[in-house]
Regions:
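Conserved catalytic core of nucleotide-sugar-dependent glycosyltransferases
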Residues: 66-149
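Short beta-strand-to-loop acidic/aromatic patch adjacent to the donor-nucleotide binding site
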Residues: 53-64
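Conserved glycosyltransferase catalytic-site signature
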Residues: 40-45, 62-63, 70, 128-133, ...
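Active-site acidic short loop of glycosyltransferases
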Residues: 51-54, 145
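Active-site loop/turn elements of alpha/beta-hydrolase fold enzymes
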Residues: 11-13, 89, 176
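Glycine-rich, basic loop-to-helix element that forms the pyrophosphate-binding segment
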Residues: 34-50
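C-terminal catalytic/acceptor-binding lobe
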Residues: 127-128, 148-231
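Acidic donor-binding segment of Leloir-type glycosyltransferases
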Residues: 1-34
Length: 231
């Protein structure tokens, strides 16, 4: 069994979400933020530092995974075989609106979805790195955590994997797919504007072109400017 806590952060001008259940292991935080752009990386770093566990999962609210894959991914970090671990093998399937509604109503389950998996759209090819992942909390924060230079939607999923690769830190993938629920695409599901798109793309290119020593210095300088202690 796994002792687990869930942390949810809402950033907006006014709170819109209320927890449906009361549980001492579920924590919800509201941050007043008038910006229309959600600074996801900054808030994820905050949640990561608040988390009490040694292993932290970062999870999009619109994805589903079989329990066995989640446990396999956690186990890889527990055993010291990975610093970052994905609870799926890279296949990221987009569910249509109809099946997403059936799942929400509990008229369809994960097993039934997986049986018809090849009817769904395989987004981003067979090697996706978005949606959900686990990390060794202390090691991940030491090597930069989430890159707060990404403001709004951007290629931060690819950047964190590239950073682990340059630093020589092991990544694990569990066997099996990830399912993405249908939802309308709003402002924070795509680049906010051309300026932000350019800045976020350039940040990925900047990191991807660094040597290990250059990246370590960049991480140290960046974390100092964000007020994150990585010592």
């Amino acid at each position: 069994s796994i002792r687990m806590e869930i942390r949810i952060l809402e950033a907006d001008e006014h709170p819109h979400y209320e927890l449906k259940i009361s549980d001492e292991h579920i924590h919800k935080t509201f941050v007043r933020d008038a910006s229309p752009v959600f600074h996801r990386t900054k808030y994820l770093n905050r949640l990561m530092q608040e988390a009490e566990g040694a292993i932290v999962g970062i999870w999009d609210t619109d994805v589903l995974l079989p329990k066995e894959q989640i446990l396999e991914a956690v186990d890889a970090i527990r055993k010291g075989n990975a610093v970052m671990s994905f609870p799926y093998d890279g296949r990221f399937y987009m569910l249509p609106q109809e099946d997403s509604l059936l799942l929400k109503k509990r008229e369809m389950n994960m097993e039934e979805c997986c049986q018809k998996i090849y009817e769904y759209v395989l987004a981003h090819g067979p090697n996706s790195v978005g949606g959900a992942f686990w990390v060794n909390k202390n090691v991940y924060i030491k090597y930069g955590g989430e890159n707060q230079h990404f403001y709004g939607w951007g290629p931060e999923d690819a950047e964190r994997c590239k950073r682990m690769e340059i630093l020589g830190l092991p990544i694990y993938r569990a066997q099996g797919p990830l399912l993405h629920l249908f939802h309308p695409r709003m402002q924070n599901s795509w680049f906010g504007n051309q300026r932000l798109e350019y800045a976020n793309r350039m940040e990925f290119i900047r990191v991807a072109g660094m040597t290990r020593s250059q990246l370590l210095q960049y991480i140290w300088l960046s974390c100092n400017s964000w007020g994150i202690n990585i010592c």
